[in-house]
C-alpha cells in the first residue's frame, strides 16, 4: 500500500496479526452500522486522507434523513504519523514502457456532433466531419441503418445542450456514450461524444440490453433457461409480467433491483424481486445482476474470460440497474433499445428520451402504468432546467 507520504502504508505495516487486514486481499463489510467497531481497511483509508481529508462541512454525516444522520466513517484518522518520504525508500524504481494499443474508435460526426464510432459496429467515414454508416437489424421489421443513425443523432444533439452533472467547470455540457441494440442484443451502433468517460462505452450497451431484455416476450423463459427462475417467480409474485406486455425502462428495473422496495424511510424494508433480501444482500451479493455474471466472475480469477456472462448476446455483458435507457418500438413492436452512459443518471435519462423520439414505447404499456406494492414504477426522470 503506497499512498501519499506512505501514511496508509505505515499503518498496514504495523502488527495487526490478530485482525483481517486489507493487505490480504480479503474484502470486509459492516453488517451492523450502528455499533462502533473499526475495520483495519477503514483505518487505512482514513490514514491515507491525512492532508487531503474532505471538509467537515460537506461530509455525508452532515445530512439527516427523517432525523437519522447518515454515517461517514466508524473511525477517525490518526492524529499524526511519522511518514516515510518516497525518495528515501530503498530499491530502484522500475519504469516499464507500455505501448498504447491501437484504438478501435474512429473520428466521425453524427447529427452535427463530433465524436468517435467503434469500427466494429459502424463503417467509419474517411473524413471526421462526415457521418458513419451504422448497422441494420437482421430482424424483419427491425431498425434500419438510417433509423439507427437517426436515434443516435437525436441523442447526440441533446447531449451537447444538456448541462452536465459530473463535470467542472459548472455549465459544462454532458459527454456520453450512446448505444443502440437490436432485439437480440446485437449492437447496431455505438457513438461516443468527445471526452466522454471510457467506462460509458460498456455501460451504455449494458443499459440498452437491459431495457430490451426485460421488455422482450421471452424474458421469463430466457431467465429460467439461465437458471434464474427464482427471480421470475419473485416478479410473478409482484404481478410483473416478463412476457413483453410491459415496456421496462432501466430506471424501473433499477427500482426493482433495490434491497429495500419501495425505497424510503417508511418502507417495510422488503427487497425488490431482483434483489437479495436485507441480511443477505451486500455489494458482493446483490441479486440478479451479480448472479448472471457470477460464473464468469469466478472464472476470471484464473484467467481472462471472453464475456461477462454465459448468457446469449441479449445480455452477454450483464445487466445494468442505473437509469439511462428505454426500449424502442416500431408500430407497437419492440425493435431494440437505446442506452446512454457518461453523466448523471437523470441527464442520461433525458438524452435517452431524446434518442427514442419516433420509436417510443406505447404509453399504455410503459412501466409507469404499473403499480408494485402500492408504488408506481417510474419510467424516466429528467433534471430541472436541464439545458444550457
Locate the predicted segments by residue:
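Intrinsically disordered, low-complexity terminal regulatory regions
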Residues: 63-199, 203-215, 219-220, 384-388
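Juxtadomain coupling helices with adjacent low-complexity linkers
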Residues: 27-108, 114, 141-149, 341-388
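Short, basic/aromatic recognition patches
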Residues: 4, 13, 140-179, 204-205, ...
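Sensor-regulatory modules in signal-transduction proteins
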Residues: 328-330
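Single conserved hydrophobic/aromatic residue that forms the stacking wall/gate
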Residues: 1-20
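Terminal peptide-recognition signature
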Residues: 19-22, 185, 332
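Serine endopeptidase catalytic core focused on the charge-relay Asp
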Residues: 38-45, 198-305, 351-354
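Short glycine-/small-residue motifs
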Residues: 21-24, 189-190, 336-337
Amino acid at each position: 500500500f503506497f499512498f501519499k507520504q506512505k501514511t496508509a502504508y505505515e499503518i498496514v505495516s504495523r502488527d495487526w496479526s490478530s485482525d483481517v487486514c486489507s493487505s490480504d486481499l480479503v474484502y470486509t463489510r459492516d453488517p451492523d452500522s450502528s455499533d462502533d467497531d473499526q475495520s483495519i481497511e477503514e483505518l487505512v483509508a482514513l490514514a491515507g486522507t491525512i492532508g487531503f481529508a474532505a471538509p467537515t462541512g460537506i461530509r455525508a454525516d452532515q445530512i439527516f434523513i427523517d432525523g437519522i444522520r447518515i454515517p461517514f466513517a466508524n473511525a477517525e484518522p490518526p492524529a499524526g504519523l511519522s511518514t516515510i518520504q518516497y525518495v528515501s525508500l530503498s530499491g530502484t524504481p522500475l519504469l516499464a514502457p507500455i505501448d498504447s494499443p491501437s484504438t478501435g474508435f474512429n473520428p466521425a460526426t453524427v447529427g452535427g456532433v463530433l465524436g468517435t464510432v467503434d469500427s466494429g459496429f459502424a463503417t467509419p467515414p474517411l473524413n471526421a466531419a462526415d457521418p458513419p454508416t451504422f448497422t441494420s437489424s437482421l430482424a424483419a421489421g427491425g431498425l434500419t441503418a438510417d433509423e439507427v443513425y437517426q436515434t443516435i443523432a437525436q441523442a447526440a444533439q441533446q447531449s451537447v445542450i444538456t448541462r452536465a452533472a459530473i463535470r467542472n467547470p459548472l455549465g459544462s455540457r454532458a459527454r456520453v456514450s450512446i448505444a443502440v441494440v437490436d432485439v437480440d442484443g446485437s449492437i447496431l451502433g455505438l457513438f461516443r461524444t468527445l471526452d466522454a468517460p471510457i467506462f460509458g462505452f460498456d455501460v451504455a450497451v449494458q443499459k440498452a440490453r437491459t431495457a430490451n431484455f426485460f421488455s422482450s416476450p421471452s424474458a421469463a423463459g430466457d431467465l429460467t433457461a439461465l437458471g434464474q427462475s427464482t427471480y421470475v417467480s419473485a416478479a410473478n409474485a409482484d404481478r410483473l409480467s416478463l412476457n413483453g406486455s410491459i415496456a421496462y425502462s432501466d430506471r424501473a428495473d433499477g427500482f426493482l433491483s433495490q434491497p429495500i422496495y419501495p425505497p424510503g424511510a417508511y418502507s417495510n424494508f422488503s427487497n425488490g424481486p431482483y434483489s437479495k433480501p436485507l441480511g443477505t444482500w451486500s455489494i458482493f451479493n446483490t441479486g440478479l445482476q451479480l448472479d448472471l455474471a457470477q460464473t464468469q466472475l469466478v472464472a476470471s480469477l484464473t484467467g481472462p474470460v471472453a464475456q461477462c456472462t454465459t448468457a446469449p448476446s441479449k445480455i452477454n455483458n450483464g445487466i445494468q440497474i442505473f437509469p439511462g435507457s428505454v426500449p424502442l418500438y416500431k408500430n407497437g413492436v419492440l425493435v431494440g433499445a437505446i442506452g446512454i452512459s457518461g453523466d448523471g443518471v437523470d441527464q442520461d435519462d433525458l438524452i435517452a428520451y431524446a434518442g427514442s423520439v419516433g420509436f417510443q414505447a406505447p404509453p399504455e404499456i410503459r412501466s409507469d402504468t404499473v403499480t408494485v406494492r402500492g408504488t408506481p414504477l417510474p419510467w424516466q426522470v429528467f433534471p430541472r432546467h436541464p439545458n444550457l
